[in-house]
Regions:
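Active-site HxH/HxHxD metal-binding segment of metal-dependent hydrolases
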Residues: 37-107, 142, 195-205
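Metallo-beta-lactamase
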Residues: 6-8, 70-121, 128-131, 143, ...
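Conserved beta-strand hairpin/beta-sheet module of binuclear metal-dependent hydrolase folds
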Residues: 1-48, 126-142
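Short, function-defining helix-loop hinge/capping sites that tune catalysis or transport
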Residues: 23, 42, 68, 72-73, ...
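Accessory terminal helices/loops
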Residues: 163-244
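Short active-site segment of divalent metal-dependent hydrolases/proteases
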Residues: 63-64, 122, 141, 182
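Active-site neighborhood of phospho(di)ester-bond hydrolases with catalytic His/Asp-centered motifs
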Residues: 32-35, 53-64, 76-81, 116-118, ...
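Active-site-proximal segments of metal-dependent phosphoesterases and phosphodiesterases across multiple
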Residues: 139-152, 186-189
């Protein structure tokens, strides 16, 4: 079994089948940020680095982030994810809501919830003020596939979410996303915003790909790829014509 590896002081990550999740320890509790996809024994893995009691927060409800949730009696999640969690992915368990600007106190260490909608309605990341970084989530990657296909994805909301992050970018220098490159500079946020706007405006040509046995359209914006519904190509071309 892969174990947790140190990310920075009292913070670790675990690679789990193409996705990573995180563990952040304070003086009284340790926060598990997502649970991966393969059902890793998280309590056993965490015991190798901390004896503190564990609590869980999910950055969003996609199954590659909730695969080990059954190991916890309760979890924390933005309420906009609860319908997806229970009704689409049929997950169970007690869910406690977390909202924008909520603070998770681990004992002399606090992580703030930042809402970044778009990839999913209730996607969040955790702001570690003391270490000037964001931990977890899918909205920001380098050389990754950002999934924007399916009924609960929204590219316009994604732009809004990243613009919200950009407004707060003086508070952090680095992002530790759940996929692709481990450490991403905050300076990529404007590039992602512009890339998403270009896709919405029909300025980026897409190519058809098969992902998880589904045909999607891939828009390459140099630093990333947005994977969208096939109908996105037609919609974007129509919107692009409106600007001609």
């Amino acid at each position: 079994m892969n174990g947790f590896k140190e990310l920075y002081h009292n913070t670790w990550f675990l690679d789990d089948g193409g996705v990573r999740f995180f563990l952040a320890a304070g003086k009284e509790k340790a926060l598990v940020i997502d649970t991966g996809i393969t059902g890793v024994d998280i309590h056993k893995a965490a015991k190798e680095v901390t004896d503190l009691p564990l609590i869980l927060v999910n950055t969003h409800a996609d199954p590659d982030h909730t695969g080990g949730n059954a190991q916890f009696s309760e979890l924390r999640m933005h309420p906009s994810e609860m319908m997806i969690y229970h009704n689409i992915f049929h997950q169970k368990g007690r869910v406690l809501p977390v909202f924008e600007e909520d603070v998770i106190d681990l004992g002399k260490r606090q992580l703030e919830v930042v809402h970044v909608p778009g990839h999913t309605p209730g996607s969040i990341t955790l702001l570690d003020h003391d270490n000037r970084c964001l931990i977890g989530g899918d909205p920001i990657q380098i050389d990754g596939d950002i999934y924007m296909y399916g009924p609960h994805r929204d590219m316009e909301a994604y732009v809004f979410g990243l613009e919200h992050l950009l407004e707060r970018s003086s508070e952090f220098d680095w992002i530790y996303p759940s996929h692709s490159q481990l450490k991403v500079p905050a300076s990529v946020i404007p590039e992602l915003i512009q890339g998403a706007k270009d896709v919405l405006s029909g300025l980026v040509s897409g190519t058809v790909r098969e992902v998880h046995e589904k045909q999607v359209i891939s828009f390459d914006i140099e630093i990333d790829r947005f994977l969208c519904d096939l109908r996105q190509q037609e919609n974007d071309e129509m919107e692009g014509d409106a600007y001609d």
